[in-house]
A protein has these predicted regions:
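Active-site cofactor/substrate anionic-group-binding motifs, chiefly glycine-
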Residues: 66-88
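Short, Lys/Arg-enriched N-terminal segments with co-localized hydrophobic residues
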Residues: 4-14
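Glycine-rich oxoanion-binding loops at beta->alpha junctions
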Residues: 85-126, 172-173
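Glycine-rich, mobile lid/loop segments that gate access to catalytic sites or pores
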Residues: 127-205, 214
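An N-terminal, well-structured beta->alpha segment
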Residues: 15-56, 64-65
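Conserved phosphate/anionic-ligand binding catalytic regions in large, soluble enzymes, centered on
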Residues: 57-65, 138, 206-215
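Conserved small/polar residues in nucleotide/adenosyl-binding loops
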Residues: 220-225
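Short glycine-rich or small-residue beta-strand-to-loop segments that form or flank ligand, phosphate
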Residues: 52-58, 97-104, 131-143
Length: 225
């Protein structure tokens, strides 16, 4: 009986280890599937482009996404720009200019980098492609305000202080911006815009992730009483 019991304990421990290994593999695969670089590589694999390819990467994962795109496409990328949070640029990327800017409140670097991106996509033709890599944090990092920068910073601080959620904040941001709510895509015309978007908002509303620079603006209003 003692030997049988010992055997059963060993067998149970072995099964637990096997289940743990399976669970670990599932978790590792799930994490790998949502890594920024993996998402970009999967999307760009075997993709062909006509004309110029201009890369614009915006958000807290912008550098990783741009690096993955550069590894995939190499010199097929004519030029590009990364706009990310301070401390998030790991190293230079060939043919791509990297900016670090303010988050969660936009700063002068946000405005300067966004203007550089606008100038980069101007003058393209219908055969060209803007590869737009978007991740969370883009609302503050990517901005050309319709009002003064100081006014926008003040409004952003007030929204954050009062406890507004991300959808409420981005709804207001879109109305004060020259690039949000699909306006950046309009600035890229007649070039084609290929967006790869990493969502950080529940439900994945494309018009709200980084305030939807390449997505048509949807109006959010309170329901009628």
């Amino acid at each position: 009986m003692l030997l049988t019991g010992y055997y059963n304990v060993r067998k149970e421990n072995l099964m637990n280890k096997e289940l743990r290994a399976v669970a670990d593999n599932i978790i590792d695969a799930a994490i790998k599937a949502v890594l920024p670089d993996e998402a970009v590589k999967k999307t760009l694999k075997d993709r062909k482009f006509d004309g110029k390819v201009i890369l614009v990467a915006v958000g807290k994962a912008a550098w990783q996404m741009a690096k993955a795109a550069s590894d995939c496409l190499g010199d097929r990328i004519n030029e590009g720009i990364v706009i990310t949070k301070y401390g998030h640029v790991k190293e230079p990327i060939e043919r791509i200019e990297c900016f670090e800017a303010g988050h969660p409140v936009p700063d002068e670097n946000s405005f300067k980098a966004t203007q550089a991106a606008i100038e980069m996509v101007s003058g393209l033709n219908k055969n060209d492609t803007v590869l737009f890599l978007l991740s969370g944090g883009g609302s503050a990092l990517f901005e050309k305000p319709k009002i003064t920068g100081e006014e926008l910073q003040d409004i952003t601080n007030q929204l954050l202080a009062c406890g507004a959620d991300i959808v409420e904040i981005n709804t207001i941001r879109k109305r004060l911006s020259e690039v949000k709510g699909g306006r950046f895509a309009k600035l890229c015309e007649p070039a084609h815009v290929l967006s790869i978007v990493l969502s950080d908002i529940l439900g994945d509303p494309l018009d709200m992730i980084a305030s939807g620079p390449a997505c048509a603006c949807l109006l959010y209003t309170s329901p009628s009483p």
